[in-house]
C-alpha cells in the first residue's frame, strides 16, 4: 500500500509546477477521451481526512457536468474514512494531474514524471514507463 506513497513539501516548486501543468493540460485529457484512446483513465486530486491532505489517484468510470466520477485507485494513508475502490466525484477544478495508461505508455502523469526525476534513474527505470504527450 504505502510503497507508492511519496511525500513532498507543499513548498516544493518543481512538484507544484507539475501539478499546475497537470491541471492546465486537462483539455488534452478530454481530447484523448473523446478520441477513444485505449487505456486506463485516472485523475489525481487532494483528499483530506483527519486534518491531513494527500494527493491520490481515482480511476474514471464516468463524467458529470464539470466533474469526474470514479473509484479511488489507491488506499488512502491519512485515515479510514475512505478506502481503495470507494466511489468519488471530483470537481474538475480540483484535479491536479491526469493519466491515460496503456501498458507501459502513459499520457500526462506530470507529477509522476517529477517524482521519477527526483529518484535515482535506475529506480525510475524499474517502472518501465514511457511518457507521451
Language-model segment annotations:
Residues 1-57, 61-133:
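Mixed-charge, low-complexity intrinsically disordered regions
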